[in-house]
């Protein structure tokens, strides 16, 4: 199978305020902070900074740290590799979406469960054709 960088849309400055509520629903403040916390935990050289918001053509999206490549370590599954900023953003956002999906499923919040289930499926469809899909799969395994 050949991989090509899937089409994505960088969210413009004028749309940044509406992107996170679109992506995470009314849980957006917590979910955004959780992405930053995971970056701090999983990327040893991460010192904070600007994040790009990426919208997928078929819906959903992800957050991506500004930079070229990041060393990412997931102590829960022994993942320890350097990946592109794009792959790092996908990994971190996917982890947050998945954890929030199960949190709201277990608490009985049908609306947020459905939103996170949809966002999870949209991001996985994007990952399937990403040039770094094998690294992303390994990080999320």
Curated annotation (Swiss-Prot):
Question: Highest taxon of the source?
Answer: Bacteria
InterPro entries in alphabetical order: Antirestrict, Antirestriction_sf
Question: Which keywords annotate this record?
Answer: Plasmid
| Listed Pfam families | Antirestrict
Q: Does the keyword Membrane apply?
A: no
Protein family according to the UniProt entry: Belongs to the antirestriction protein family.
Protein known as: Putative antirestriction protein YubI
